[in-house]
Amino acid sequence: MKVYFSGSIRGGEPDRGWFKRLIRRISRHGEVLTENSFGYSPEEETGFDDAWIYERDMDWLREADALVAEVSAPSLGVGYEIAKAEQWGTPLLLLYREQPGRRPSAMLNGNKALEMFVFTEEEEALKAVEGFLAQLESRSRDSSSQ
């Protein structure tokens, strides 16, 4: 399985340690296409050509069997990736860390076609990722055996 992981890199306060833990968990189920995108420092990331990043990421997103997006920090890029994945029929799981005085984006939370998992503890989110990917793997096995 190929999974596209999405999270805020330039916007908000990217939690790179949390993203790396998520990526490690996702990688138990297959290839994380965007894994290396989260290994760059913010300075390195802004040094890449934006058109190159866009083309690379859209290629990966087209190739992905699923998208897991961490949406706790607002990000236009993450929202764009979610919209494209939804348009293309790619299964999605959105993760939102509950924060006092803040709410998830109404455009994401109000879209009943999107699965958003709200969590307070990281382990809850990791278990949600496991369940989401295991369900996709099961569907894939079922459809290939028919």
Residue ranges of predicted features:
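Conserved catalytic or regulatory cores that recognize and/or transform ribose-phosphate-containing ligands
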Residues: 1-146
